Amino acid sequence: MRKLTIEDLDVKGKKVLMRVDFNVPLKGGKVADDTRIRAALPTIQYILGKGGRLVLMSHLGRPDGKRVDDMSMRPCLEVLEKQLGRKVFFSDECVGEKAEAAAERLKDGEALLLENLRFHPEEEKNDPGFARKLARLGECYVNDAFGTAHRAHASTEGVTRFFKRSAAGYLMMKELDYLGKVVGTAAKPYMAILGGAKISGKIDVITNLLPKVDKIIIGGGMAFTFLKAQGLEVGSSLVEQDKVDFAGKLLAEGRDKIVLPVDFLVTDTLDIKARQVGGLKEAAAEKIPAGWKGVDIGPKSVERFRDVLKGAKTVVWNGPMGVFEIDKTAQGTFAIAGIMAEITATGATTVIGGGDSAAAIEKAGMAEKVSHVSTGGGASLEFIEGKTLPGVAALTDK
């Protein structure tokens, strides 16, 4: 998949309309985590350094097509100015005369941040009229928002119809490069680690990866549906009854490929909302007591997974191994994060597929010690499923 990149564009003296993903968490009107803003800096700095006139657009939160002051892009402006060490202009509109006038005032090497795209219902509806208004703000288009690439919205897909050339930014290029290896020509041995609560959210991922990988390690709540398919009793652990037959079919197809946990950390009570857990003990996979539920993989499972991953050349990880929101039940997930860092140091390509696993590896302090942490939760998942991402397909082919 060869797409036009930022380096293929001549941006000097031109207005560059760039879609970024500044959908960051806010706390008390301030940016609580600036990871996504930092991720876009290489492309922003490249365009400004080349004398481009940069117009940045993003969404933040879910304002449902109306102006919500608490979801303004203004807190991002403060962070962006600090990180760039220069003034960034702001428009409290993202389309129309006000926004167009602000874009026109830009000089070479200056940047403008537009107000939240989703203050307009037309953005998520991919309205052609709204896309045309956005297109008036630039002479060329760059998409560096991989996290929204799975959405066919006006700023990611519709707008490209009004530009001769639409290019990928550095972050988009990096995502496509690493995730492309995972779904394409991965160096072997190639392993996948899949976790999370439910098998239903990972059906397409498993189906797409099973023929390609050497092993799939299954952890998290979804493991219990597989164990149930093997005829084991799993106490009060989460089981998707309507997926037990499917899990059994996968086990038959995958035979030697699917690796399941052999022990768990189990509890008698769990309240995820209150972040509280009752009594905890270790139990073998086949000996989970009635009334108890698995909330993390156990130490023997960690060692089993470590052995399986030893010598791997490519590993993709999507989904935590347990209830990682609670410290006591996050140790299995943190252990996997540590193993990922270890095998990266021995030369493996390691990719963390966004969402909860990205949050987990950040929390474990291992984000800098793996090859790539995807910035796209749903986007990376759909890419690994083998689906076409509208925001990527819309970019100009080389």
Language model region names:
Residues 1-398:
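Active-site loop-to-helix "anion-binding N-cap" substructures in soluble metabolic enzymes
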